[in-house]
Amino acid sequence: MVSIPATSLYGLGRQQPFQDLSKSLLTHLNLFTPQEAQSQAVPGTRTETEPTGSSPSDLQEQRKLADDKIIWAPLDYLCSFPGKDIRGKLISAFNQWLQIPEDKLDVIKRVVGLLHSASLLIDDIQDSSKLRRGFPVAHSIFGIAQTINSANFAYFWAQQELKKLGKPEAMVIFTEEMLRLHRGQGLDLYWRDSLTCPTEEEYLEMVANKTGGLFRLAIKLMQMESHNTEDCVPLVDLLGIIFQIRDDYQNLQSDLYAKNKGFGEDITEGKFSYPIIHSIRSDPSNFQLMNILKQKTEDEDVKRYAVRIIESTGSFDHCRKKLENLTAEAREILKDFGDLGNTDGLKGILDFLELKG
């Protein structure tokens, strides 16, 4: 008999790392119902009692289970200390008025949870990150090759989960948004690696594709299942941009962010984030910031000097003002949605995303 934890990624509190990772992926993503688990080798489960004798099919199943645990291990490790789960909260908030059936909602949450976690594994490799949520990145534990394979496996597992929605349109949405996400990521990487500073408009278009991709995927799948015909995509695109600009700001200004990811990680990565782009374009005659990005430095004194340059051009103030304007725009859209159902959850997310202080 297989022991299946009932909880999902959504609603879990922070767990201690270095727990028994053999349980974590199923616990967080709730990939199967108990009935399905009886007939499938589920990564991250264990038998409650060992049979006194094992048939060839039992042994084959046990071997497959052991293999799957190896394949899932990097993702298991990442999921053993969940983040803020903004995407899960966003899905729940939109469902207050989209009102899709619970079984469909669970599938969409699993799909987005898998895709998001897999994308973090890949991002950390592409960005040469050291920390994720305050702990060593997965590829520092399992190696780059195994981590890439685990992430790719999760992408296709998410695709397989879509079949449970029973609609061909779901696959069209999935493919379209994954292509947009990777287009956005490709431009972000190109700008960094070629030391090409984009315009703010180019950056925001990239963000709409990249950061907004999983937001949009989730909401489009929900709209597909909902009787509510209001188009939520413009609001979702706006939320994706707000989320990214806020993240860019926090990367260079937040002590908590520094604790979880390292101080000024975007500078070490050489990334053209929103405040960095504004600073460079505000003073094209000053090449210091561009040269610091080129070095991909880990020297904290140099990074703090870069932050002072960004501050001197008013770029952090510009970020705060941009976020205020975008948040006000999102609240105006919510007013139009108010007559269609409960929007308290979405208002709560906007409150959370507002910079404090």
From Swiss-Prot:
Catalysed reactions listed for this entry: isopentenyl diphosphate + dimethylallyl diphosphate = (2E)-geranyl diphosphate + diphosphate; isopentenyl diphosphate + (2E)-geranyl diphosphate = (2E,6E)-farnesyl diphosphate + diphosphate; isopentenyl diphosphate + (2E,6E)-farnesyl diphosphate = (2E,6E,10E)-geranylgeranyl diphosphate + diphosphate
Protein task: Geranylgeranyl pyrophosphate synthase; part of the gene cluster that mediates the biosynthesis of meroterpenoids called sartorypyrones. Within the pathway, spyE provides the spyF cosubstrate geranylgeranyl pyrophosphate (GGPP) for the prenylation of triacetic acid lactone (TAL). The biosynthesis of sartorypyrones begins with the production of triacetic acid lactone (TAL) by the NR-PKS spyA using one molecule of acetyl-CoA and two molecules of malonyl-CoA.
Gene that specifies this protein: spyE
Cofactor note: Binds 3 Mg(2+) ions per subunit.
SUPFAM superfamilies: Terpenoid synthases (SSF48576)
Residue sites binding isopentenyl diphosphate per the record: K84, R87, H116, R133
Positions of dimethylallyl diphosphate binding: R132, K210, T211, Q244, N251, K261, K271
Protein name: Geranylgeranyl pyrophosphate synthase spyE
Annotated spans, Disordered: 36-60
Alphabetically ordered keywords of this record: Magnesium, Metal-binding, Transferase
PROSITE patterns: POLYPRENYL_SYNTHASE_1, POLYPRENYL_SYNTHASE_2
GO-annotated molecular function: (2E,6E)-farnesyl diphosphate synthase activity; dimethylallyltranstransferase activity; geranylgeranyl diphosphate synthase activity; metal ion binding
Cofactor(s) recorded in Swiss-Prot or TrEMBL: Mg(2+)
Cysteine-cysteine disulfides: none
Pathway: Secondary metabolite biosynthesis; terpenoid biosynthesis
Residues the entry annotates as binding Mg(2+) 1: D123, D127
Gene disruption phenotype: Accumulates dihydroxyfarnesyl-triacetate lactone, 17-methoxy-16-hydroxyfarnesyl-triacetate lactone and epoxyfarnesyl- triacetate lactone.
Comp. bias intervals (Polar residues): 50-59
EC number: 2.5.1.-, 2.5.1.1, 2.5.1.29, 2.5.1.10
Ligand binding (Mg(2+) 2): D123, D127
One Pfam family named in its UniProt record: polyprenyl_synt
Residues that, per the record, bind Mg(2+) 3: D247
InterPro entries: Isoprenoid_synthase_dom_sf, Polyprenyl_synt, Polyprenyl_synt_CS
Family: Belongs to the FPP/GGPP synthase family.
